[in-house]
Amino acid sequence: MSYNLTDPYEIARYIKEAKKSTPIKAYIEGDLSNCDFTNIEKFNSGDLYILFGESEEILVIIEKNKDKIKNCRIEQDRRKSAIPLLDMLKINARIEPGATIRDKVIIGENAVIMMGAVVNIGAEIGEGTMVDMNAVVGARGKLGKNVHLGAGAVVAGVLEPPSSDPCTIEDNVLIGANAVILEGVKIGKGSVVAAGSIVTTDVPENVVVAGAPAKIIKEVDVKTKDKTKLLDDLRK
């Protein structure tokens, strides 16, 4: 079944209809030689087993063979998850431990996703863009090239409340720590959003906005560019 992931209602339907998954990893010491491991990924040496699979299938094996099991440890990091995480192996970007990136996200060359950042389904992260610690890019949020999304900042998604237009952050924008960009807002090229601002309306190119709600306080000048310049070495 296909879904139009540019439509917030279609994204919601995709999440609703997706098969929910509770994958676990089980480390087991015991005799499981007569078990059926269909649909379970198994690695073993003698009586030592590592199992990867859905919780209900592995837990059935553990329960049926509890008299043969000496030790068991289970690791779990989600429950009834609807959307898998992005396969990051072939992405040419720096993604630090603890970042959470869901499937169907696009990440450009030499982007940086820092610890604790969350990037939701359908989002696009441009080339050379940094999503700093604990920042959030909501569903279908679009960040252009060489953007800096500051620590704890939020780019709202399209799901709740539903919005047909995603947030769009154009190239070379700097968004300060803990700023919030509300649903459907567009930030023009080269602009700066001050830390802690709440942006409720579109922002033109090459201006500085601040406050709650954010207002234009000046145009970007040489001093502003010097204070907000990015470091290429962080993106290598």
Curated annotation (Swiss-Prot):
Keywords assigned by UniProt, alphabetized: Acyltransferase, Amino-acid biosynthesis, Diaminopimelate biosynthesis, Lysine biosynthesis, Repeat, Transferase
Disulphide bonds in the chain: none
Domain of life: Bacteria
PANTHER family registered for this protein in UniProt: 2,3,4,5-TETRAHYDROPYRIDINE-2,6-DICARBOXYLATE N-ACETYLTRANSFERASE, ACETYLTRANSFERASE
GO molecular function, one term: tetrahydrodipicolinate N-acetyltransferase activity
Protein name: 2,3,4,5-tetrahydropyridine-2,6-dicarboxylate N-acetyltransferase
Encoding gene (name): dapH
Pfam families assigned to the protein according to its UniProt record, in alphabetical order: DapH_N, Hexapep_2
CDD domains documented for this protein: LbH_THP_succinylT
Family named by the database record: Belongs to the transferase hexapeptide repeat family. DapH subfamily.
Biological process, per Gene Ontology: diaminopimelate biosynthetic process; lysine biosynthetic process via diaminopimelate
E.C. numbers: 2.3.1.89
Protein's UniProt keywords contain Transferase: yes
InterPro entries linked to this entry: DapH, DapH_N, Hexapep, Hexapep_transf_CS, Trans_hexapeptide_repeat, Trimer_LpxA-like_sf
Pathway: Amino-acid biosynthesis; L-lysine biosynthesis via DAP pathway; LL-2,6-diaminopimelate from (S)-tetrahydrodipicolinate (acetylase route): step 1/3
UniProt function note: Catalyzes the transfer of an acetyl group from acetyl-CoA to tetrahydrodipicolinate.
Catalysed conversion reaction: (S)-2,3,4,5-tetrahydrodipicolinate + acetyl-CoA + H2O = L-2-acetamido-6-oxoheptanedioate + CoA
